[in-house]
Every structure is written in structure tokens, then in C-alpha cells.
């Protein structure tokens, strides 16, 4: 079953890699460099986001970013993919996300996390 995924990633190389992995797995991927790019599709099942809106990686700013993502895609699960996890975050729940993957991430872990959140 094709699932709609929005990928918010400002690094074009990482965006291309993740897009290829998800597309190869049969998903429809909308790649954006910011939350504002593109239209809001309420049928989106999953959002994978870097903490692209942040200049630093403090906990309050990260939580605010995830809240903006959730407001834009209220029905979607959210994965944070980041090279710099904010200090004080013990896991996804600390950010308000469903999962946090630290870059560079293991492809198998990434795939299992995506499929788990999509209910596949």
C-alpha cells in the first residue's frame, strides 16, 4: 500500500538518499527544504523532519518546531532525523515526536521505524 510521506530536509544529499529509500519501499514522498514549501496534504501519514528551522538545538525551540509540524499535519506520525539532538531530550516524547533518529542513522533501523509508524 502506497503511503504519503513528507520529508523536510535542508541537506540535498540526505534528502535524495532518504527519498530514494522511501520511494524504493513503495511510498509517495514529498521532499521539502522547509515546512512552508509545497501545500499541506491532509492525507499525509508520516512526516520525517530535520530540525531545519532552528539556528541552535535547544529543547524549547525543538519542541516548538515539532508543534508547528504537528499543526500542519495533524493526522501524521512524526520522525525527527537530526545530527544534533537538543540537550535534555531523553527521546522522542521529550520533543513531542513519535521517534527520533540520530544521523547518520542505520538504514535497517530507519526502515523499521518508518514501517512501524505507518502500521505496515
Which stretches of residues belong to each language-model region?
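Conserved acidic carboxylate
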Residues: 9, 82
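Conserved phosphotransfer cores of two-component systems
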Residues: 41-42, 67-75
